[in-house]
Amino acid sequence: TVAGPPIGGAKSGINFDPADPRKEGVLKRWYAAVAPMLRNYYGTGGDLNVDEIHEVIPMTAELGVLHPQEGVVNGYYKNYSKVEKLRAITRLQSGVLLPIVDERFTPDVSKKYTIADMITGWGVSEGVRHYYELWGGTMNHKTAIIQGWGNVSAAAAFYLAKHGVKIVGIIDRDG
């Protein structure tokens, strides 16, 4: 693993129309199939057209998965006691739902964006910032085009702009 926990890496997806009324059933069957991995060494979350708070967390909880990242905790922190692992998972359970109250980290405090809404976009921005920190240069006065306008891309654009990046365009699946 280049930058993350030494537990391997994978990406999974479902090729399915998110507007199809059978979406909930498809997701529930998929989570049931991967639940053993979600408990031991794999993590999942919200992504394209799948909401972490309203779909992923409740659907995986119905299967006895404590948190969609439970497997990452169990896989990465092998030396943790059961109590320490449970404490880490409990922090995930409460942490992702917390509203961001510091105006430096949210476009609008009154909209009550949560950690789950903003964290991946923040990570994208931090990755870009870290690149310039390692290789020289600055983000200030750079230009960027953002692909999509979901949680990740919108939050990434917000944090990139905070670092002085000028967002000059947004592209979505329709162009």
Task: Set out the residue ranges of the language-model regions.
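Glycine-rich Rossmann-fold phosphate-binding loop(s) that bind the pyrophosphate
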Residues: 148-150
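Aromatic pocket-lining residues of Rossmann-like dinucleotide-binding sites
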Residues: 160
